[in-house]
Amino acid sequence: KSVLNNELFLTLLNSTIGDSSFKVLSALSEAPIELVPAMYWWVTNKLWHLNSKPAIERINHRELLEIVMHRIISLDPNYHYGGAYRFFGVFYSRIPGVEINQSKTYFEKAISSNENYFGNKVQMAEFFYQKSENKPSFLIQLQQVINLDASIHTEMMPENIYYQKRAKNLLNQQDTLFE
């Protein structure tokens, strides 16, 4: 809810014409770059919450999630190490009826936007490779992350250490994940 309570957003919202849902979507689609962090974390947290819900919940929120993340891509595509691309990689692997290659395309964009951020590769393995039942690529990608030095890029070090541990956990679960 942080972005919805932001003064800058509320000013934009109040100047928009239409019913409440249309106003929110319109205001989000025109949000300025200053709102990128608030929008990113709001929608990212919303997705992680929705991932534990039935697929219909993700479908019901699809328009909102896509509008916000496409706005972020238009303003700051590399925000949080290609986070909007990574978001779509995860999201499109979890929406029924969406071609799984859309997930792959977005994960590849996330990785190319910041190859040093391990989360892009680990989430690609966890969501895309698992969904597409590509165990060899899953194993290779996770092992590559484990073999990297997480301390080289100090600004990413805490998250890279986390994702190395996540990669190890996923490798330990491979038999369950690929039954």
Give the positions of each predicted feature.
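TPR/TPR-like (Sel1-like) alpha-helical repeat modules
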Residues: 1-3, 104-105, 129, 136-152
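Conserved structural position within tetratricopeptide repeats
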Residues: 5, 73-74, 108-112, 147
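Amphipathic alpha-helical repeat scaffolds of TPR domains
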Residues: 5-15, 31-52, 78-93, 118-128, ...
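Structural signature of alpha-solenoid helical repeat scaffolds
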Residues: 30, 35, 57, 76-77, ...
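Terminal, low-structured helical/coil segments at or just beyond the last alpha-helical repeat
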Residues: 141, 147, 151-179
